[in-house]
Structure formats: structure tokens, C-alpha cells
């Protein structure tokens, strides 16, 4: 909670302005300075600085809560606990949809519908609460320049034709989606760490980052000495900031991730196909074996609360798999992508056992083995 702005701690406006002139904006910035440095910046006595340090420390330190207290607080809170995906079977499995106050990751190969899902959720967050929405605005951070305003309008008109029956409603919804194109790691982190005031002033109810892996894999080569450590440090800071925003404002945060091929030692030595951006040790399996896994490695995978995998079944059908969730079992759904976005083909869901996962379809699109030159690992979903 060190990213909390000093303006929200209870300091006077005059003091906040004085601190901001020295680039001291957050609790972390303040607490990293010594008492002597703070005396110089604020012009206060040692006792005055000590009182400020105690105030800021109390404001950003996590407070002890009992389980009963948390339950009572959530019962008294009238804000929604979930954002519905309008995919009824998926919502049922997730006990309501995408959880507020947590990080939900969507991972899969290119073209399987990750951005389509994000655009669809952007529309849903702006809808009135009686339609399952959050009646708020959206921050959409686009690192791949994949967002399409035309597609947003098309999904809105096709999915909710009765509601979006006038141009005014379409304009209102599109004006609530605030798009930021950030193409470097520093830009993404700066944007995330500056969102607190925007969430308050603009009534932001959903934050989307599409995608996490795009900028990280371009800027960090894990094979270079020191890069892996710096990359993990960046990812930890990014995840911490996003979790703070999700928990502090009880909003859902949706992230997209890419996939990577994980090769055994023998095959990796013959062909340099292992993504350097993934801190994964080579498998000890059979010579020449490989599998497909979510990018960014184990460090990142433990940061997200829920992981949904999108994967191909054939040229038309795709599959959503709940691979990680504190509420739902391993579950899969078949869907297609149409004008109205993602559409489930089956209204019921089935739990997937560990044995059945070993026979689940590959994450990659169907290709002849001679084109791949690899033996795909069918237990992809278990490596998280």
C-alpha cells in the first residue's frame, strides 16, 4: 500500500503541494526519506516530522482484520462482488463472473479472442447495474495497439441491440472507455501507479491491461546476466500496484498474457526456440519433448488470482478453461467469436479432472506434426 497518494492520507493541501515540488507524491516516497531530509523539505521540527511519519505509516500499513469483520464489511458493502461476463455457464462456474478486488488473467495464443474478451468486458462495465454492469468507466491500457473502437461499437450494438438503440447511448458508453497506449515497461508502470486519482475522479470500475507480456518480452532478455532479476522485480512491482488498486477500490482488474513453448534440454540445444523472456528451467522429460505454457514464468503466475486459458479446438471453435481460481474447479467451455463477441456453444459446464486434462487439446491452433516439428505437451494446464 506504499503507492497510496499522500493526498489521501490526511496531510494538509499546503504540505502536499510542498512535497510534490520535490517529487514526493506517495507514502513510499515519503517513508523512504530520513527524518533530516523531511525536516529540510517540510520546514518542520523533528517532533513534527516524527508525527507525520507515524501518520503516513499508519495510513499505508495493512490493518489486522478478523474473518468475521471481513464478512460483515462485505455484507454491508452494496457494491457488486463480481462483474458478469454474460456467458451464463462461465458466470455460474465463477460464482458470478470476474471477481472485484482481484486480478484475472486471460492467456492464450494470438487470434483466440483475448482482446475481444477485454473489449466485451469494457462494454459490460459501463452498463447499468440492473443489466449486470458496474455503471462506471473503464481504463484500458493497450500495449499492442490492438484495441478497436469500431469493434467496441459493433459488439455493443450486436450484444445489446435494445439498450444501444440510439447513437447517444453508444457515444456515452464509448466516452467512458479511457484508452492509453503505452509501449514500454516504464510507460506502463507509470500509468498504473498514477491511476489512483483517476479511479476516484472518473469513477473507474474496471482496469484492463492488454497485454502484460508484450512490453516485458521485448525489453528483457532473460539470458543476459541480471535481466531476469530486473524483469521479476518489474513484474512484482506491477502486480503489487494492480493488486492495491483492485483491493483498495474493490474493482476487477483484467490482464492478458501470451504463451511460450517450453522445450526439453535436448531439443532446446538443437534449436534456440525457448523464449528468453520466461524464467523457466528446461524440463527433465524425454529428449525432444515440449509443451506450451503461459508466458512470464512462475513468479508472475503466483501474482494473479484467476487464470482463464483460451485455446483452439478447430478452425471455428475455441475453448475457455478455468485453470486457476479460488472459487471454481478445473472447468471448460466451448465458444465461438461472432459479431456480438464471445458466444458459448454449450449452456452447461463440466468439471475437468487431472486425468482428463492430460488429454485436453493443445493451446496452439491445430497444425500437422511435420509443420510443428515438436511433440506438444497435453498437460499444459497443470504447469502454473
UniProtKB/Swiss-Prot annotation:
Site note Breakpoint for translocation to form HMGA2-RAD51B, residues: 252-253
Tissues and organs where the protein is expressed, per its UniProt entry: Expressed in a wide range of tissues.
Any one Pfam family match given in the protein's UniProt record, by short name: Rad51
Record-linked CDD domains: Rad51B
Keyword Flavoprotein among UniProt keywords: no
Gene Ontology biological-process entries: blastocyst growth; DNA recombination; DNA repair; double-strand break repair via homologous recombination; positive regulation of cell population proliferation; positive regulation of G2/M transition of mitotic cell cycle; reciprocal meiotic recombination; somite development
Region (Interaction with RAD51C): 1-75
Sequence intervals crossing the membrane: none
InterPro entries: AAA+_ATPase, DNA_recomb/repair_Rad51_C, DNA_recomb/repair_RecA-like, P-loop_NTPase, RAD51B, RecA_ATP-bd
Disease (UniProt): A chromosomal aberration involving RAD51B is found in pulmonary chondroid hamartoma. Translocation t(6;14)(p21;q23-24) with HMGA1. A chromosomal aberration involving RAD51B is found in uterine leiomyoma. Translocation t(12;14)(q15;q23-24) with HMGA2.
Protein name stated in the entry: DNA repair protein RAD51 homolog 2
Gene: RAD51B
